[in-house]
């Protein structure tokens, strides 16, 4: 049986640029959790200044998640005022 892409389950590597202020991580992780996206690891890589705003680079690696759940979560994350950009969304293949 061939699955639709929304039914495929995989891990994801996400790289986001967000405002470097309290509550941003809670907003993002709350959205992911509400869409059944479990976080395997998360790290703040660096801070930078964009148009005089202090920004942070966040890298998240998820546990296995359905493609559709990830798409739905990212659609909500895109609406956050604290989001600068979603730099990467990469499927991670298991070994």
Residue ranges and their predicted role:
Residues 1-95:
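A conserved regulatory-domain signal marking ACT and ACT-like small-molecule sensing domains
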